[in-house]
C-alpha cells in the first residue's frame, strides 16, 4: 500500500467504481471476505483509514526516521467507515467495487499467501522446503533426518531471545506481536494491530500469538484475530488451527504444545 503504482493502491483510488483486478488480487480479496466472516470481523482489511489515523501512514522505515513527529493524518477519534461486507466481488468478470470512502490494507493476509505460493514453487520437484518471510513460515515435506520441523518462539518482551520451541509436521506458522511495529504518536505508544471494533490499536492483554495451520494465510489471519480478540476469540478457531499466546508476564497459553520453555 506504500507504493502509489501498486495494484492495491490503484484499487483504493478507484473506490466507488468497478475496477478490473488480477487473478491474484481477486483471490486475496475472496479469501479476505471468507476470513472476515470466519473471525466475526476481527480480521478486517478495511481498517486502513484507522491505521493512518493511528500514525501508520507511511512505511516503518519512514516512521522510525520521523520519530514522534505528527503523522500525515492527525490523531483523532475514530470515524465511521464503510463495512468490509459492502465490497462487491464479480468473480466471473474479475472486477471489484468498493464503496466510497473504503481503503484496504491486505498486510494481514498477503505475506502469508505469497510465502506459501513461493514455497510450493520451490518444492515443485518434490523436495522438502521451508520459507521464512519475516516470521511467517511455510513448511513442505520433512527436514533431513527428522520427522518434524522445529520452530523457535521469540520472547516478545526481549527481542532476539527465545522463550520456547515447538514442532510442526508441515503447513504454516505465523506470529503476530504488538511489539514488532511500534511508534509514538503525541508521546503515546502505538502499534499496527487495529481492533476493528474500536478503530484503535488493540489491547487484548496478549503480547504475541503464534498460530499453526494447514495454510499460511489461515495462520496469518488467525494470529492477528486472536491477538486482537484475546481469549474471547479462541472459540472462533477451526479444529485444525492451533495457537500459543504470550502475555506481559511471559506466561504461555494455548493449544499448541511447546516442547521446551526457557526460564
Task: Describe each model-derived feature in a short phrase.
Residues 1-263:
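Mature catalytic core of soluble alpha/beta enzymes
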